[in-house]
């Protein structure tokens, strides 16, 4: 009741007609953790460990308002506005967008649900079946810097349709308008897929693609992915994921395979040197071509010479008691670079979650990332790449949801 009253006050402050809603609720989550990460690049060949207070590692910190109105005849109007933030600094998330996590309005009924606005696509639902569901942001970087979208990316200017539940199956399709005058395809995004849940079995399959444009309908990590090369309307990202999980008593075993294709990045490369882990600091006067190639973002996921990547994700969630779960997972990512050897990343994660109550939980995670023939994406929250072929991070945190 207190939440509903507070939500009405918030909406009134924005001048909204809160009184028209059948129900309005404020909700959110706050996730803070202490972290230590070793072998972070501090310049040149130097490295150092980092102690930090992180936000949203396992569950993105957020504050949202949602409402539903019964229109009669089995039809309901609904809306959600959700803001992301960093609890360690108080800064807004999603590059400062006010309702960066979600802003939608729509209708639901026997026909399914239609939502319009800024929202995630079905690959977020598919990803939640495996490691992203257990570890959250812990595994987003090894998942091709989340270019496979399994840890949640948003689509601006979008309309999404979700089917009713048919004996455990729910389908979804999303379309993002590029809003480019004279070129409908520029900046356009499209995705579809579905999930199936029946007893101990859970399966998901999703596909998403985005096109280059002055405005990109989709949030895409990696500046090179949909920026430069080709022309407006050219497809710059294609990705799909297949995931499955099965509950064996107290143990949930899961796995997924993701593939990302970046058609435009390869088109921009005319020369590709062999990978050299010391090229970035071998010649500070930039007298060698390798240094120039590194500066342009080669040998990184979504970089100038990265044309595709694929990720295998395997894990187990073992429930020891109603309050305690042990979680573990492994990710193997292989990145294909133009006219040179493939890069590889392997990340191992071990952790535990303990529920103090229905709304409050604690967690501890240790993870190790190893790379070869490419630059490390790093484990640190501020995204400073690891400077070594092996990097370890430790986190202990607290989550409160309301």
Regions found by a protein language model. Name each.
Residues 4, 47-61, 98-101, 153-157, ...:
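Residues that define the transmembrane beta-barrel architecture of outer-membrane proteins
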Residues 4, 22-28, 69, 73-77, ...:
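Outer-envelope beta-barrel architecture signal
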Residues 193-349:
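Detector for outer-membrane/organellar transmembrane beta-barrel domains
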Residues 22-36, 51-180, 186-188, 195-205, ...:
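Outer membrane beta-barrel
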Residues 9, 64-66, 104-106, 160-162, ...:
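Outer-membrane beta-barrel architecture
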Residues 354-356, 388-402:
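Outer-membrane beta-barrel "beta-signal"
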Residues 35-41, 86-90, 123, 176-182, ...:
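Sequence/structural signature of outer-membrane beta-barrel proteins
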Residues 1-21:
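Gram-negative bacterial Sec-dependent N-terminal signal peptides
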């Amino acid at each position: 009741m207190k939440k509903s009253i507070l939500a009405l006050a918030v909406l009134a402050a924005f001048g909204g007609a809160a009184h028209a809603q059948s129900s309005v609720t404020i909700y959110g989550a706050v996730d803070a953790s202490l972290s230590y990460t070793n072998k972070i690049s501090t310049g040149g060949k130097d490295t150092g460990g980092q102690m930090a207070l992180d936000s949203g590692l396992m569950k993105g910190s957020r504050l949202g308002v949602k409402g539903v109105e019964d229109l009669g005849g089995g039809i309901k109007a609904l809306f959600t506005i959700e803001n992301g933030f960093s609890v360690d600094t108080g800064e807004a998330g999603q590059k400062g967008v006010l309702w960066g996590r979600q802003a939608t309005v729509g209708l639901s009924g026997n026909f399914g649900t239609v939502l319009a606005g800024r929202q995630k696509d079905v690959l977020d639902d598919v990803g939640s079946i495996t490691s992203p569901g257990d570890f959250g942001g812990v595994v987003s970087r090894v998942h091709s810097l989340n270019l496979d979208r399994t840890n949640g990316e948003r689509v601006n200017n979008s309309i999404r349709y979700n089917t009713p539940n048919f004996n455990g199956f729910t389908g979804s399709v999303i379309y993002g308008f590029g809003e480019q005058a004279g070129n409908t395809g520029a900046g356009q995004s499209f995705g579809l897929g579905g999930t199936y849940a029946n007893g101990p079995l859970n399966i998901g399959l999703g596909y998403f693609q985005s096109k280059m444009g002055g405005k990109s309908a989709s949030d895409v990590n990696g500046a090179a992915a949909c920026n430069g090369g080709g022309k407006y309307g050219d497809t710059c990202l294609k990705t799909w994921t297949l995931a499955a999980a099965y509950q064996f008593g107290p143990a949930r075993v899961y796995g997924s395979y993701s593939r990302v294709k970046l058609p435009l990045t390869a088109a921009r490369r005319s020369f590709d040197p062999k990978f050299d882990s010391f090229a970035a600091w071998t010649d500070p006067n930039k007298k060698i071509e390798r240094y120039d190639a590194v500066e342009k973002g080669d040998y990184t996921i979504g970089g100038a010479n990265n044309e595709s990547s694929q990720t295998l994700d395997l894990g187990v969630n073992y429930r020891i008691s109603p309050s305690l779960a042990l979680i573990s997972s492994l990710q193997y990512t292989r990145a294909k670079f133009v006219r040179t050897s493939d890069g590889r990343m392997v990340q191992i994660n071990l952790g535990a979650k303990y529920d103090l109550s229905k709304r409050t939980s604690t967690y501890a995670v240790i993870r190790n990332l190893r790379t070869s023939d490419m630059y490390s994406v790093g484990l640190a929250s501020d995204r400073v790449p690891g400077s070594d072929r092996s990097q370890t991070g430790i986190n202990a945190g607290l989550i409160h949801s309301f």
